[in-house]
Design a protein with these regions (language model features):
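Short, well-ordered alpha-helices that flank and scaffold nucleotide-derived cofactor binding pockets
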Residues: 50, 81-85, 121
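Glycine-rich nucleotide phosphate-binding loop and flanking beta-alpha elements
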Residues: 9, 28, 72, 135-136, ...
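Short coil/turn connectors at secondary-structure junctions
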Residues: 17-18, 58-62, 85-89, 123-126, ...
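A short, flexible beta-alpha/helix-coil linker loop
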Residues: 27-31, 97-100, 156-160
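Flexible active-site lid/hinge loop adjacent to a nucleotide/diphosphate
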Residues: 104-188
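Hydrophobic/aromatic beta-strand patches that form the interior of the parallel beta-sheet core
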Residues: 22, 64, 91, 149-151, ...
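ATP-dependent carboxylate activation and anion-phosphoryl transfer catalytic cores
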Residues: 1-67
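Walker A (P-loop) phosphate-binding motif
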Residues: 55-101
Length: 188
């Protein structure tokens, strides 16, 4: 078997060169174990996954999700910076961009579920800071099942009348989704 690893400079960290594993080659292959011409089939794929991600270990990227009417982008930038200074590779979404490890990957309003999935699919990210706005939640949901930390900053009338949300109570119901899907700490 072999592991194929791509990098521009093998003497440097993969984080500096954007290197990474592109393929794991099992030898002599899995098919002979999964569908043998003789004998009992074996779930070797499951055994490989159990070795890579042992049962009971954390395989999910920790998520901090922020929502509110005002201050989401500022707070998400601040949290992303704190986490980066603590040594993490941060994936962040905001009304400005998707940012991975301090590098802008996509510009524009990236507060919806598609951008959240972009961050969570990036193999270099080890913590996510996701700004989640009313529009994305109403149109398409969150882009993640749960978060570890959720923050609902405020609910004010600034964005009423958009996307079928016409009252403060209605806006609060949309924003409280973040508190409801938080498995750890909720900041109100």
């Amino acid at each position: 078997g072999a592991v194929d690893f791509l990098t521009t400079d093998i003497t440097k960290s993969y984080r500096e060169t954007d290197g990474g594993i592109c393929e794991v080659n099992a030898g002599p292959g899995l098919r002979m174990h999964i569908a043998p011409s003789e004998g009992t089939p074996r779930d070797v794929g499951g055994a490989i996954m159990d070795m890579l991600f042992p049962p009971g270990t954390q395989a999910r990227v920790p998520i901090a999700a922020l929502t509110g009417t005002n201050g989401k982008t500022t707070c998400s930038r601040m949290l992303a910076h704190i986490l980066k200074m603590a040594g993490h590779v941060v994936g962040q979404t905001s009304t400005d961009a998707v940012v991975i490890d301090g590098n802008v990957t996509v510009k524009g309003d990236m507060t919806g579920p598609v951008s959240a999935k972009m961050v969570l699919r990036d193999p270099s990210v080890d913590v996510a800071v996701l700004e989640t706005a009313r529009g994305g939640i109403v149109r398409s949901g969150l882009g993640f099942n749960f978060c570890d930390v959720g923050a609902v900053l405020n609910v004010t009338s600034d964005h009423l009348g958009l996307g079928g949300v016409d009252t403060i109570d209605g806006l609060a119901r949309v924003k409280r989704v973040i508190a409801e899907v938080t498995r750890g700490t909720v900041v109100l």
